[in-house]
Amino acid sequence: SLVQFNKMIKFETRKSGLPFYAAYGCYCGWGGQRPKDATDRCCFVHDCCYGKVAKCNTKWDIYSYSLKSGYITCGKGTWCKEQICECDRVAAECLRRSLSTYKNEYMFYPDSRCREPPEYTC
């Protein structure tokens, strides 16, 4: 669920998903066009991952996971819940690895500036 993903982001980056990632660059949030930096690419990959489990309720399905010893571990559940958890875990870890690229200028980045043709495909 979005609430759980936010907790994973905060665990990994020490930044809350809201406001730091909810509307960052061209992909964090609604997503579209070309990622602005490595942080935004994490969101692109997360969108692609969610696209692979489109039949699942990615925004609201509550899954099992734990945050221990610096690691996120996804628990057992339905196929959908396990896949959503993995998408969120991988994205949160990617955001941590990309902290050095985070630019405040991309917070609340206007969609109107995300018009370049896509550079990547899922």
From Swiss-Prot:
Belongs to the phospholipase A2 family. Group II subfamily. D49 sub-subfamily. It comes from Crotalus durissus cumanensis. GO terms for cellular component: extracellular region. The keyword Hydrolase applies. The active site is at 46, 88. Snake venom phospholipase A2 (PLA2) that has a strong dose-dependent anticoagulant effect. In vivo, intramuscular and intervenal injection causes muscle necrosis. Induces moderate edema in the mouse foot pad. PLA2 catalyzes the calcium-dependent hydrolysis of the 2-acyl groups in 3-sn-phosphoglycerides. Its EC number is 3.1.1.4. Its cofactor is Ca(2+). One of its GO terms (biological process) is venom-mediated suppression of blood coagulation. It catalyses: a 1,2-diacyl-sn-glycero-3-phosphocholine + H2O = a 1-acyl-sn-glycero-3-phosphocholine + a fatty acid + H(+). Ca(2+) binds at residues 27, 29, 31, 47. Expressed by the venom gland. PROSITE patterns: PA2_ASP, PA2_HIS. Disulfide bonds join 26-114, 28-43, 42-94, 48-122, 49-87, 56-80, 74-85. The lineage of its organism: Eukaryota, Metazoa, Chordata, Craniata, Vertebrata. It is found in: Secreted. This is Basic phospholipase A2 9. GO terms for molecular function: calcium ion binding; calcium-dependent phospholipase A2 activity; phospholipase A2 activity; phospholipid binding; toxin activity. Pfam families: Phospholip_A2_1 (PF00068). CDD domains: PLA2c. Binds 1 Ca(2+) ion.
